[in-house]
């Protein structure tokens, strides 16, 4: 956990929230009561940007929760895998939803070979993928630009593929924004 937090501290601006050119809200889930906490402009500002990003990334099987004021925060995707409604409530007239979660299919043989943690990760991926699909299909708010990079075959921890992720994200964004 400390290594990931250190990484976020290095790549994100020191002045954090103030450095953002657009409003940014990051969600995390309270491990105790399951409530959603929002960090950023319009939410809590007493947590650094790096810690908020870490909290929203914390999958306890891999990274421990972020502890703040006696509460433990985990991956915000457990309750809001695409926070479309919150973006609308924050005043967005057009919403850009970027979906980088795992898709519908997975290599069962590979998952089973990797063991129970991989099975757990795949179960979580299926649940959140289905929820993201429902959120997009049922969206009745302001215009939604849905960006879905092609990431099938890649996993959460494929750090060696960052260049591909950036290029694919750029391609998917251009495609979505061009209509």
Each predicted region: which residue ranges?
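Patatin-like phospholipase
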Residues: 1-179
